[in-house]
Design a protein with these regions (language model features):
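Hydrophobic structural segments
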Residues: 1-322
Length: 322
């Protein structure tokens, strides 16, 4: 009876030119379409968000995240809407509907649905008018008319840069907000907790042998590949982790001072070129991302109490070990 499947790895990883049933992917897409089932896959987004796959990997091993290994280049901006006080609640709701103010570098204090509206300084708006459009009631001196004292409110939020245009358009669609002043401002303090991989540390050092055993247990690994720097009795406290194929970040992990790097799909030459004392653990692509279902289940059951959410027990690792 389900009508939505949520997955980490996308059903359609490469673009389809047709859906004719000639490949496994095409047949799966056809089955979903015929059954009216939507498929939502959070792949790179779940890899790079705070609390995503790499965070969950560290949590499984009992390590505390210190920071992101490779910070995201996604740019954020601050959108500021100055409008009459009576429109502030409507503006706030529009921003909330677009998930504004939930970004890591925002305290979202101005977007709490029940937060009191905070006025800017009591503003005096001067409207310059052409001579022929002057109101009948003159102002205090020639050429200056219609001096209005209006209580204004400024509503602000931090949003990804790509959302700004759509947000601004939505605000102007609010009845009465056509003339609202909308400023989109750059940020110097870009979020540092979004990106790929994490650097984490254990409360107490563990041996590499203990770490290997824990990896096998927590991620269900039949086997793991390790680099020449692996020494069973060597102690490890700081580790770097990256779910999925993380070979390109070996240098980042080494520069960050990690004593062990846990990822997947490490190439032969990456193992051969690693001349440092940092040990590399290749635990398998599927295994490294096995915590994704836990993340989805936790988010959905906590946010949507009235949804029937089923945790699939089907494991579909395409790699088999002999």
């Amino acid at each position: 009876g389900c009508n939505l499947v949520v997955s980490h790895h996308p059903l359609i990883f490469k673009g389809l030119r047709r859906i004719a049933g000639s490949t496994v992917t095409e047949r799966a897409a056809m089955a979903a379409i015929r059954s009216g089932i939507a498929v939502y896959s959070a792949h790179t987004s779940l890899d790079s968000t705070m609390g995503g796959v790499s965070y969950a990997m560290a949590s499984r091993l009992g390590a505390e995240v210190e920071r992101v290994l490779v910070p995201s280049e996604l740019q954020f901006k601050r959108i500021s809407v100055t409008c009459p006080r009576e429109l502030a609640a409507s503006v706030r709701l529009v921003l909330l509907d677009h998930d504004a103010g939930t970004e890591p570098c925002s305290d979202n204090s101005s977007l709490s649905p029940t937060a009191p509206v905070a006025d800017t300084d009591s503003a005096v708006s001067y409207y310059d008018c052409e001579e022929e459009s002057l109101p009948k009631s003159p102002g205090p001196e020639p050429g200056v008319v219609d001096i209005r004292h209006t209580a204004l409110t400024r509503v602000e939020a931090v949003v990804p840069a790509w959302k700004c245009a759509g947000l601004a358009a939505s605000v102007t669609e609010i009845p009465g907000a056509e003339s609202a002043k909308i400023d989109i401002l750059p940020l110097d303090n870009q979020p540092a907790n979004l990106g790929l991989g994490v650097l984490a540390s254990f409360p107490q050092p563990v041996s590499m042998a203990e770490l290997a055993d824990k990896i096998k247990k927590e991620f269900g690994c039949r086997a793991i590949r390790v680099s020449a720097a692996y020494a069973p009795d060597a102690k490890v406290r700081r580790i770097a982790l990256c779910g999925g194929a993380g070979g390109e970040f070996i240098g980042k992990a080494r520069s960050a001072g990690a004593q062990a790097y846990i990822s997947a799909d490490i190439r032969y030459h990456d193992f051969a070129d690693n001349r440092s004392g940092m040990a590399i653990f290749d635990i398998g692509h599927f295994e490294s991302e096995s915590c994704a279902k836990d993340i989805f289940y936790h988010v959905l059951t906590n946010k949507f109490a009235n949804f029937a959410v089923y945790y699939s027990e089907i494991e579909s690792n395409p790699v088999k070990y002999l």
